[in-house]
């Protein structure tokens, strides 16, 4: 049986507010296999972002286990989890979060250089990703000189620079028109399928869900199959 790239087991996550304790995740289980696209839908406030942050090792749950590429992540210290996150997870957000003072190629190369890759090698990898994205002629343009769709394709390339095992996408096409959405998301799907990465996508755009292998929603802190 193929080892999942992500496995959440019995995850509990509670926020403490002035109004009292709010349990967002309650014994939540999730498995994402290599090359699998899993969609997460539901209304705002249902816990989608909390689930993504937990899966991405950005938040620590009160209970449960997180296995990423077979590694028991909650047994690691903060530095260990940070290292795993940088090496094995790629993030794509609704807003591209590109560094405005750097051009496209250096924005993509940045995660590689942070991971210790030499600048020349990092730029070589970034250049090949730009070519796949159809943006080789935009390599030395800063984010402000790119269209919204181009910015998001650069952000996707940056997320894939370290050859992650898992890609986490939070409303990745939320700011794009339908035509650009199809192109950008289609590129993401093609690349992760080729690399065998698992993908967890939270979206309000039901047009994207037709690309998913599974569609889930959160109800009472647990993941269930989404039924239209």
Curated annotation (Swiss-Prot):
Residues 6-227 form the ABC transporter domain. The complex is composed of two ATP-binding proteins (LolD) and two transmembrane proteins (LolC and LolE). It is an enzyme of class 7 (translocase). CDD domains: ABC_MJ0796_LolCDE_FtsE. It is found in: Cell inner membrane. InterPro entries: AAA+_ATPase, ABC_transporter-like_ATP-bd, ABC_transporter-like_CS, ABC_transpr_LolD-like, MacB-like_ATP-bd, P-loop_NTPase. Keywords: ATP-binding, Cell inner membrane, Cell membrane, Membrane, Nucleotide-binding, Translocase, Transport. This is Lipoprotein-releasing system ATP-binding protein LolD. It comes from Hyphomonas neptunium (strain ATCC 15444). The keyword Translocase applies. GO terms for biological process: lipoprotein localization to outer membrane; protein localization to outer membrane. Its EC number is 7.6.2.-. Part of the ABC transporter complex LolCDE involved in the translocation of mature outer membrane-directed lipoproteins, from the inner membrane to the periplasmic chaperone, LolA. Responsible for the formation of the LolA-lipoprotein complex in an ATP-dependent manner. The keyword Phosphoprotein does not apply. The gene is lolD. ATP binds at residues 42-49. Belongs to the ABC transporter superfamily. Lipoprotein translocase (TC 3.A.1.125) family. Gene3D superfamilies: P-loop containing nucleotide triphosphate hydrolases. It is a peripheral membrane protein. GO terms for cellular component: plasma membrane. One of its GO terms (molecular function) is transmembrane transporter activity. SMART domains: AAA (SM00382).
């Amino acid at each position: 049986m193929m080892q999942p790239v992500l496995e959440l087991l019995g995850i509990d996550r509670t926020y403490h507010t002035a109004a009292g304790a709010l349990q967002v995740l309650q014994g939540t289980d999730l498995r994402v296999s290599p090359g699998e696209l899993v969609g997460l839908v539901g209304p705002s406030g249902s816990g989608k972002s909390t689930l993504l942050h937990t899966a991405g090792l950005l938040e620590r749950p009160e209970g449960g286990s997180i296995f990423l590429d077979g590694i028991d992540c909650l047994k690691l210290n903060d530095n260990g989890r940070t290292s795993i996150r940088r090496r094995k997870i790629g993030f794509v957000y609704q807003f591209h979060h590109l560094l405005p003072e750097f051009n496209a190629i250096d924005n993509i190369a940045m995660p590689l250089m942070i991971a210790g890759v030499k600048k020349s090698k990092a730029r070589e990898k970034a250049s090949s990703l730009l070519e796949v994205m159809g943006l080789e002629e935009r390599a030395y343009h800063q984010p402000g000189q790119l269209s919204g769709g181009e910015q998001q394709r650069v952000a996707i390339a940056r997320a894939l620079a370290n050859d992650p095992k898992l890609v986490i996408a939070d409303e990745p096409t939320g700011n794009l028109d339908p035509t650009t959405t199809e192109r950008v998301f289609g590129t993401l799907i093609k690349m992760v399928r080729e690399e065998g990465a698992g993908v967890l996508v939270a979206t309000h755009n039901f047009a994207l869900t037709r690309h998913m292998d599974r569609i889930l929603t959160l109800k009472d802190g647990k993941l269930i199959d989404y039924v239209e």
